[in-house]
């Protein structure tokens, strides 16, 4: 089957924003104007097409990025048909992983901002993520009809807070209740959209007299930005004092693709004004897959390799989302970077070293789907029934293997225990959590060996709330959630501590006899290089002359290793200890493996108590990005949490504070940081090392244990 739309007319873009910028309403209008959605879905009554999971409709925030295909022939229907693959991304801080995941597979982005609220903290996080992947973007200042709307203020914030070179493409006509339309600076005409047709028809009018000067000034700024794209354009601009419409667009496009400028549009999605012109901007200014550099990866010999965005190149794609669909089972969303794939073809997954057959391929329109027979370079689609694919895996041709850059997912920052409410929920809970973890790599599940509890970890409290909520709704599993636990460890500080224990029982018949003398010491750096170190514990057999027969030595080691899984202080694992077996005795008849195992275990417990035992706590490496205004409060709070400041850096979003903070002090931190900084500070943390816990903490943990 031939390609219906040339790849140059594809636009794979995401709609990005913070909560309440009107992102979902904007996406809805895009679907309406591109002719996909016949009744406009309003987020206010919970019926938006893009927000298709139940909780999203209830909470009014977007959780899952749904991929949708739509077509556009321009606001005045005069363009050749362009194919849009639109990815709706969540704006809540607990879902930054979803944003990161969709940015990886996009070519461009539309950044939706609220004309009243402007650049919000979450906008800063999302902007930083877009910079990381060098995503060309344009901005849409939405909600121009709201009280307090101020277009110029938002453009200034784009420059000041995000360090963006913002270039307005329009000037609003009026604001708040008086918002009527926009001035198109390219054509120098006012655009008025027809309310009766919900904005599907429009007319050009003359610019209102009071806006002529403002528009003229804004236009020269725009033309100058375009002229800076190349020497040829700059020469023409300097000689003629102006550029043609095509020249302006080509200059602006070139600079947008290089992520040098951010063109800015405005409107009110709710009032059906402005989205249509912004879509024309997507066509004129955002890249097609062919405009982006060839995708990079490594071949089977670990050498760098690339794939061009053409149908004839070997097939390569990236799985960027896994979803469980109640009707078709597992859906794998993937972006095709090169080549062609037909339903029924086999693909190779180099990350798992497995072949998979692609059954049905679905083109998604929000949660409606259309079955298609093939996909080509630039397409975004969903495959049904791939078994071993996880988010971030590559799918490629078997004879031309390439592994595309894997997505790096942050470590979860919050954990808590979950237990099923009833016995019948037990098995279902395991299956449900497994499914959810496959869908979302930032969510982890493990069984705590010490407590036997199931521990779930994620990116924030809301993230885990929603996981528990989804278990209930989608898998009918009712669960109780507990308070998070910290994984402490135990060790000793004194060296060469001798411990002598004799396990002897004679009560008629065969008795039990095992006698060991051990020496306990903290492990040194030199000890750690020893190949016998396992689970941060070293056992050395120093017995000579058969004082203890060879066959009983493994039992001594086994007794020690079993004991260290639950330390004598509070039942946490013992780490960093070296034990030497130096002496002992045995009985010809009564000695057994069990007797030596018990003797070793008791000798260790007694010796551990004499060797200055201490409790270790996990220390997290924390990075906080905070605007200057809140720096004092944030740093004071770090000290209150027993944190040690490691240094500061500057960034466009404010100060970056690096600190080491005990994990036990970090619970509820996301919430308190948010309230301390009015939601403008963000943080990330990862485990760094274990350190001795202060006496008061150790006492509290021991009492609990």
UniProtKB/Swiss-Prot annotation:
Residues involved in GTP binding: 17-24, 88-92, 142-145
Presence of the UniProt keyword Cytoplasm in the record: yes
InterPro entries: EFG_II, EFG_III, EFG_III/V, EFG_IV, EFG_V, EFG_V-like, EFTu-like_2, G_TR_CS
Subcellular compartments: Cytoplasm
Keyword Oxidoreductase: no
This protein's GO CC annotations: cytosol
Domain tr-type G residue range list: 8-290
Coiled coil (residue ranges): none
Keywords: Cytoplasm, Elongation factor, GTP-binding, Nucleotide-binding, Protein biosynthesis
Region (Disordered): 290-309
PROSITE patterns given in the database record: G_TR_1, G_TR_2
UniProt GO MF annotations: GTP binding; GTPase activity; guanosine tetraphosphate binding; translation elongation factor activity
GO terms, biological process: ribosome disassembly
Xref: PANTHER family: RIBOSOME-RELEASING FACTOR 2, MITOCHONDRIAL (PTHR43261:SF1), TRANSLATION ELONGATION FACTOR G-RELATED (PTHR43261)
Stated family: Belongs to the TRAFAC class translation factor GTPase superfamily. Classic translation factor GTPase family. EF-G/EF-2 subfamily.
Classification via NCBIfam families: EF-G, PRK12740.1-5, small_GTP
Biological role stated in the UniProt entry: Catalyzes the GTP-dependent ribosomal translocation step during translation elongation. During this step, the ribosome changes from the pre-translocational (PRE) to the post-translocational (POST) state as the newly formed A-site-bound peptidyl-tRNA and P-site-bound deacylated tRNA move to the P and E sites, respectively. Catalyzes the coordinated movement of the two tRNA molecules, the mRNA and conformational changes in the ribosome.
Protein name: Elongation factor G
Native species: Xanthomonas campestris pv. campestris (strain ATCC 33913 / DSM 3586 / NCPPB 528 / LMG 568 / P 25)
